[in-house]
């Protein structure tokens, strides 16, 4: 192990309390990455020492303003003028306000104030300060205002522990002498124990979490740094830097940060599939009851139990990547799940679909869990943060997107390639998910770079890729009509699309029968048609998880029927 950083950062709130206990001010306003309870307690302490204080959230300040002061009043009409500049960003930063005010006529219009929202509540106008740094990134930041008598003597950014932890990690990673070429490390582990905001919201799976935001900042910023180091283009998915693992833990008081480089670790030995005690939800016929992601061992056992002609490949860390081929009748298809391992419902959907296709005597191959190393990391991270997106588990243990591998050794991708070769499939169904609650990068422009279309949920949607000269429009129109016949899915999509419209505006691609659909000519696969399913499944459990994998399964089965009927001939 190589230690890059081991440091402690004082809690900004405690620093302020100590400062104004020693020398009280007339009035203080501060914006911090702290939850409401901690801020209110600190206000009382400051008042006791002679300082009038009001402490606000630096993260999503307009939303917190409504949660903490406006929502109980239930206004009938609200008009929000966003800060000058990036209208789309500041409208998104207010999400999911539209869902939390269902009986309120809410509208957003571009404003002119540089660092504030202007909010009209039934004719009463309020200003809500929005601390963020100038420049292209426009990151959220702490802020401090201090009055001595009537004089404002301090008014500017306050570097909080949230920001300092991020900067310390990025500086340590940037200063290290890395190898000249990838892979740069086995595992780059970032351990942070810190306080902050962790608040569930009363709208579907929405939550506010500064620790989740730090996870996302660390993972994507570090990955982008190594892409630049390697001379890769923006958004590249081929680089294999190693596995980046942010470990965020809840703490109180000071923030502790530790960054270390570890060798690539092989997977711990797992029992043979036949000896795994498979729970009822992973047993054939019982997957319909699944309300949570399967473990890698459970998914492997369920794949082994399918039958058919098995084939086996190995992951980077040595885990089995299992496939099964069924030489049935009719045109062939391939079904895969778990390419991105934090998108968990597709694994169950693929297994359920495979069971049904087998009973129908269909011609197909299935690889239900393509990325077991990522799944193992997701299982590990989920122990601490079951409701976080955990994008560090998205890619393989080498740090790349397995679909992007274009040359041997193919590793995990070998199972997909064998499934395609065995079937000569005309259609590949790749079952995916995306965040079920808002995805933010508050220190780097707020909206995740390269993922602006994925930042808030827009319901279940489809992406159809096709080779030049082909047309899947009629297929997609018929498929969505059949899928929309499920009233639960239809209601789910309608609710999410209404909130999307309020906070993001027009969809980036048209909806068919209430299901957004993207069509694109694409040649990344040898299969003529690739249908990607996208359900907002990251972090969901219970009935929402069941709807997710049921929708994946229904999509596969309806698509197989349409393929059989000649809609993709």
Question: What spans do the regions from the language model cover?
Answer:
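Soluble metallo-hydrolase cores and metallopeptidase-like ectodomains found primarily
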Residues: 277-330
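Generic recognition of flexible, low-complexity loop/linker segments
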Residues: 310, 322-323, 416-417, 518-522
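Conserved catalytic motifs of the protein kinase core domain
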Residues: 330-332, 528
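Mobile, glycine- and charge-enriched loop segments
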Residues: 345-354, 358-408, 509-569
